[in-house]
A protein has these predicted regions:
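…; additionally, a secondary subgroup of soluble metalloenzymes is captured
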Residues: 1-329
Length: 329
């Protein structure tokens, strides 16, 4: 009788390629990461967005990740379903002026909670008659509640930096209305007291809010899902909709504990850049340990390239470790 098969680990690090191979990347060696990349199969290009690749068929019984818009999923983290409302995520961003277009700055904007609440309160008063409600919590994205159906296709904020904003504007039935909302918010933020104070301190102003992930409130329904370890609120919210919880990524030992706990399928994602030492100790070292201990298959997505690493890696001793910047360049 055959056994249960290898443990499946799918790992997404969408930002690591740019961080390791880009100009000015730190000259830091990551032994576990280098071992895994050196001994894995040849990389394969992935066309799907990284979250879709990571989730695979896990959410297929509920229509896939495409049926789990970010807005309602983030709302689920607050314990609300609100099936009669449309929800969108709002990302505070800093826009830069290029030669002939606007683009989102690479560096994320950090707002103190009091700053965020002050901006949200003023915007809420301005847009109250339009049926918009602004919600600020402890997460990077705010929430926008809308009292009517609103349908459009939007671009997730992790795909924005450095690109022409004109090419990324919302599309679909209500795309023009959402674009008008973006422009109106920009005008309201231009001389907002929070931004005036930030500029006086030498901090980048929040001169735009990027709405994304529009969808109706999602009714919760139980679904058996793989174990999830991630810092990504959208994925955590999608799991919450179906009665599952997720582990965080940053806590020391969190992933290692999960891998040692007997799970047969684990999805792992670091959506935001992390310090080299942290990603090595909290991600790559536990993955290497799992490979050494037993029958494990790791599918590792770095940027838009996926590598498979399995039991054969232990025999590929002739493949020498090299700095990630050299391998990924």
């Amino acid at each position: 009788m055959s056994g249960p098969g290898p443990v499946s680990l799918r790992v997404a690090l969408p930002w690591l390629h740019a961080a390791a191979a880009g100009a000015g990347a730190p000259d830091v060696r990551l032994p576990a990461a280098e071992w895994l990349v050196a001994r894995g199969d040849a990389p394969v290009a992935v066309q799907a967005p990284w979250r879709t690749w990571l989730a695979g068929d896990a959410l297929a019984p509920a229509g896939g990740l495409a049926r789990h818009a970010a807005g309602p999923c983030l709302r689920a983290l607050d314990g609300g379903a609100d099936a009669g409302l449309t929800w969108a995520a709002l990302r505070p961003v800093h826009l830069l002026t290029a030669i002939d277009h606007l683009q989102v700055a690479e560096r994320p904007v950090h707002l103190e909670i009091d700053e965020a609440r002050a901006i949200a309160a003023d915007l809420g008063r301005h847009f109250a008659e339009d049926g918009y409600a602004f919600h600020v919590g402890g997460r990077r994205d705010w929430l926008l509640g809308i009292d009517r159906d609103l349908r459009c296709d939007t671009v997730a904020p992790d795909a924005l930096p450095g690109r022409n904003l004109r090419d990324l504007m919302p599309r679909g039935e209500h795309g023009p209305a959402v674009a008008s909302f973006i422009n109106e918010v920009q005008m309201l933020l231009h001389e907002h007291p929070v931004n005036v104070a930030r500029a006086a301190r030498g901090e980048a102003p929040v001169n735009a809010l990027w709405p994304w992930g529009y969808g109706r409130g999602v009714a919760q329904a139980s679904l058996e899902l793989p174990s999830l370890c991630t810092d990504d609120d959208w994925l955590v919210g999608a799991w919450r909709v179906h009665g599952s919880t997720a582990q965080g990524t940053a806590a020391p030992g969190a992933l290692d504990s999960l891998l040692r706990g007997g799970a047969r399928e684990v999805l792992i994602a670091w959506s935001e850049p992390a310090e080299a030492a942290v990603i090595e100790s909290c991600c790559f070292e536990p993955l290497l340990g799992a490979l050494v201990r037993g029958d494990v298959v790791v599918d590792l997505l770095i940027g838009d390239r996926a590598r498979r690493i399995d039991h054969r890696a232990r025999r590929r001793f002739w493949r020498c470790r090299r700095p990630l910047g050299e391998v990924l360049a």
